[in-house]
């Protein structure tokens, strides 16, 4: 059994006081050695974190003690190593950024399709299948016959729809993403634009890979994930990709053989795109990482997680004492 449980989670729900959830959530994560990033916004929670089994269970139990976060959707996979360096809880305007005002998956959303029924849907010639993810994700793998919208960020997806899709022409649309959250927003947007039959893969690609046997699968390639594993194969095991620390894009062993590759500084995808100042900064960072590795330490910058946890627990205790005195 792998040592670390990787948990991707989200829930669209009204969180008027989401700012107040940050400190207790961060303190809990640091106390239980949970790394990764969670996003909080007025529309809900989203993120991916990793810890041992006990740590993840503690987090899920905490979420269930907050009535609005009960029933948070989550999916688990496993990693031999801790795939995150830091623990973060960020406050955002959106938990997944589409950049279009008024899109609310709690009120209108596409039709969910179970992984077991997905093959039949996308094999239908009348169904227009769209991968809502970004170029660098699709390059690694996608479903057979799916259209690549050629977007660099999710914010560009509405423009793709406006320029390339028509409710009168595309009567049936099927969409998918890594874990399901982007499709919550994209299908809600499509419905608002007048598309009537809009479907999306429930649980996303990760759930499909988990539940559909590889011999029956219509998935081709590997699946990009937003953690240190970079990508997973059909068995949800780490695939043969690394991350360029300069541009944060996935790279292969072949990329690392290129004369344009310099560890931590550039790869064939980003060589020549950074300023001299950035390149020097990347080289200095790589030097510090190397020195930290030689000392048997982990270079993540700033104070340690233990120090941050102690400081936050003291801050929460002080606030609790002040409330009792009030």
From Swiss-Prot:
It comes from the Bacteria. Transmembrane segments: none annotated. Residues 278-288 have a biased composition (Basic and acidic residues). GO terms for biological process: tRNA modification. Disulfide bonds: none annotated. It catalyses: uridine(34) in tRNA + AH2 + O2 = 5-hydroxyuridine(34) in tRNA + A + H2O. Pfam families: Rhodanese (PF00581), UPF0176_N (PF17773). The keyword Manganese does not apply. Residues 317-326 have a biased composition (Basic residues). The keyword tRNA processing applies. The active site is at 177 (cysteine persulfide intermediate). Coiled coil: none annotated. Gene3D superfamilies: 3.30.70.100, Rhodanese-like domain. Its EC number is 1.14.-.-. Residues 278-326 are annotated as: Disordered. GO terms for molecular function: oxidoreductase activity, acting on paired donors, with incorporation or reduction of molecular oxygen. Keywords: Oxidoreductase, tRNA processing. Residues 123-217 form the Rhodanese domain. Catalyzes oxygen-dependent 5-hydroxyuridine (ho5U) modification at position 34 in tRNAs. Belongs to the TrhO family. This is tRNA uridine(34) hydroxylase. It comes from Vibrio parahaemolyticus serotype O3:K6 (strain RIMD 2210633). The lineage of its organism: Bacteria, Pseudomonadati, Pseudomonadota, Gammaproteobacteria, Vibrionales. The gene is trhO.
